[in-house]
């Protein structure tokens, strides 16, 4: 079936000559400013390297790595590749690293997840069919493996050596050696493996089956299921948690909002609805709220609203007060933060100042097209070597006693 103009990306390509002459773009970031709502507008002049100028590998700095196509397989949201943006230089586009990951017909496959192993200096990209490991210094693909049952959104252990890799909505997860890609173990869960978070402690992995109202917990020493959290009000979609692995916040089917669970007792604690905005149909994911993140200081929960193209901000503590709402340019399906909590990244392309709620920039590629993706991660480099990395999930990052 032919894709609609909206699916392919409705933004018109901005003429490069206009930018070279110094024209600027105004970003529509208007947000209502009454009660629990705040205003947010911004403008920017994109700054990108000449399209034909080669960019060297390696580098030193703090970068945002964005894997595309990161919204289904829509190439209108940034094309195909691993796009690099300089966070400390106004999120300027740096380069596009060629990637693999193709359907059998040769067209780019949907990117399903992205993660980093700092010790192996590698970034990993999962697609519908397989997984590729890319060396951050050489920017070459080290290996690409097609996994039986396909792949979904994975998560790597804190020591960088083990990956929990869900099959593509099948009944199992693979436990994978990140250096070789070899399968260490297989964990049968339910029917539709989907999202994964390897706990910050390294002792537990949390697995969401998108047709189950339970969040499954595995012991990472035995690779066996040891606990179920919930059950929640409907099947679990994206989720996030506090750094001490005490509280989990989850999106669930049909809810514009989120639910809260206790990771220690296994109980569901609360159901929180977005107030003042209508629920209804969405373009993607079949769910009004697909995307949730905890600010690194663990004070706020940011929740995507695909119905109204908004980001809603809540207090992370009961009674979970609704604080404000930010208007976005397209449907958000994901949100994450920089490690320091300065910036929030919506999958609709906005770079948001987390404290002021202002939209500062739109991510744009070498052709000045807006880049949208649900698969992005912050990486710190020193001479081409990773020294620290964020996460595709917006996780709590408060220090834990004993760490």
Explain the meaning of each model-derived region.
Residues 14, 43-403:
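Predominantly soluble domains enriched in secretory-pathway, periplasmic, or organellar proteins
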Residues 9, 35, 106-108:
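Short, flexible coil/linker elements and helix-boundary hinge sites characteristic
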Residues 1-18, 25-32, 41:
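N-terminal secretory signal peptides
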Residues 36-44:
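Signal peptide processing junction and immediate N-terminal pro/mature segment
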């Amino acid at each position: 079936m032919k894709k609609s103009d909206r699916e392919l990306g409705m933004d018109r390509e901005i003429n490069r000559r206009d930018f070279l002459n110094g024209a600027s773009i105004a970003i529509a970031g208007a947000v209502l400013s009454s009660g629990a709502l705040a205003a947010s507008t911004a403008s920017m002049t994109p700054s990108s390297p000449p399209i034909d100028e080669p960019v060297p590998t390696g580098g030193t700095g703090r970068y945002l790595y964005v894997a595309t196509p990161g919204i289904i397989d829509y190439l209108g949201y940034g094309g195909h590749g691993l796009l690099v943006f300089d966070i400390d230089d106004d999120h300027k586009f740096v380069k596009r690293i060629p990637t693999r990951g193709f359907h059998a017909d040769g067209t780019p496959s949907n990117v399903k997840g992205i993660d980093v192993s700092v010790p192996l200096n590698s970034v990993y990209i999962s697609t519908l069919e397989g997984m590729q490991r890319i060396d951050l210094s050489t920017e070459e693909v080290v290996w690409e493996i097609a996994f039986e049952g396909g792949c979904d959104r994975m998560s790597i252990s804190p020591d960088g050596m083990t990956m929990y890799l869900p099959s593509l909505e099948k009944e199992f997860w693979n436990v994978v050696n990140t250096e070789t890609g070899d399968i260490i173990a297989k964990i049968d869960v339910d029917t539709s493996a989907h999202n994964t978070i390897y706990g910050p402690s390294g002792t537990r992995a949390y697995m969401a089956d998108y047709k189950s109202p339970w969040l499954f917990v595995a012991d990472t020493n035995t690779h066996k299921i040891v606990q179920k959290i919930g059950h929640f009000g409907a099947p679990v979609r994206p989720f996030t948690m506090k750094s001490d692995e005490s509280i989990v916040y989850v999106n669930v089917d049909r809810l514009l909002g989120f639910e809260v669970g206790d990771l220690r007792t296994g109980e569901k604690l609360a159901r929180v609805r977005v107030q003042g905005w209508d629920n209804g149909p969405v373009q993607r994911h079949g769910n009004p709220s697909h995307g949730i993140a905890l600010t690194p200081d663990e004070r706020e929960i940011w929740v995507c609203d695909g119905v109204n193209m908004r980001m809603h901000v809540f207090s992370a503590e009961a009674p979970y007060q609704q604080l404000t709402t930010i208007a976005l340019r397209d449907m958000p399906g994901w949100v994450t933060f920089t490690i320091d909590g300065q910036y929030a990244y919506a999958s609709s392309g906005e770079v948001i100042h987390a404290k002021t709620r202002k939209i500062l920039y739109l991510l744009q590629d070498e052709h000045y097209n807006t880049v949208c993706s649900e698969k992005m991660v912050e990486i710190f480099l020193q001479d081409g070597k990773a020294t620290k990395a964020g996460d595709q999930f917006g996780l709590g990052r408060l220090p834990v006693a004993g760490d």
